[in-house]
Amino acid sequence: GPGLGQTAWSEQMIQRVFWEAEKRDVPVIMDADALNLLTQLKLSSKLPKNLILTPHPGEAARLLNTNISNVESDRFGSAAKLQKKFNATVVLKGSGSIVCYKGNGGQKWGLCNSGNPGMATGGMGDVLTGIIAGILAQGLSLKDAAEAGVDLHSKAADLASLETGEVGLTPSDVISELRSLLRYD
C-alpha cells in the first residue's frame, strides 16, 4: 500500500498480489493506497483469506462508505464492520488503536493504551505495516502479529517522545526505539 499509487498499474499489481497470496497461502497487509484501491475497485470478493487491513479513521470511513465522525464515534463498531465486510484482521489506527479479528465464538477485540498524538504524522503507518510484516514473517498468527505490532509501535513512539517530545516525532525516531524494545540481552 505505501507508495503504491492509484493507477491502472496499481490495480493490476494488487490483483496479482491477491492471486499470489492465495496460491502460496501467505498473508497480505493492506495500508494507504492499497486501502484506497480496495474502496474504488470493489475487490472484496477476490480478497485473500489471510488479510490484515490497517486503516486510519479517514480510510475506514471510505471503506465503510460513511464519514470520519461516524467512525470516531463508534470505533469498536467500525472495526467490527470492517472485519466482517472484508473477513480480515483489522487495525483501526488512532487514539486507542483497535485490533478486531475473528476468534472462537465470533469477533474479538484488542485495545492499545499506549501511543501519543505525535504518531499522527506521515510515515507512521508505513512503520506499523513493516513491524507487523516482520512479525508475520516469523510465523505468528494474523491476530498475534497485529496486536504485537501495534503494541511495539506505540510503545516505541512513547519512548521516542520522551526524548524528542510529541511535536516533531518522526518515523525514524520510532524505528530507533524499536531496537531497545527488541533487545534480548
Show where each model-derived region lies:
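N-terminal loops that bind phosphate or other acidic moieties
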Residues: 43-44, 48, 104-107, 119, ...
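Charged C-terminal helix
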Residues: 155-185
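A general alpha-helix detector
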Residues: 59, 78, 130-131, 156
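Short, small-residue alpha-helix embedded
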Residues: 62, 121-152
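Short, charged, surface-exposed loops that flank catalytic or proteolytic processing sites
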Residues: 68-75, 139-147, 165-169
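Glycine-rich phosphate/dinucleotide-binding loop and adjoining beta-alpha-beta core of small-molecule
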Residues: 1-114
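Short beta-alpha connecting loops at secondary-structure transitions
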Residues: 63-64, 112-119, 129, 133, ...
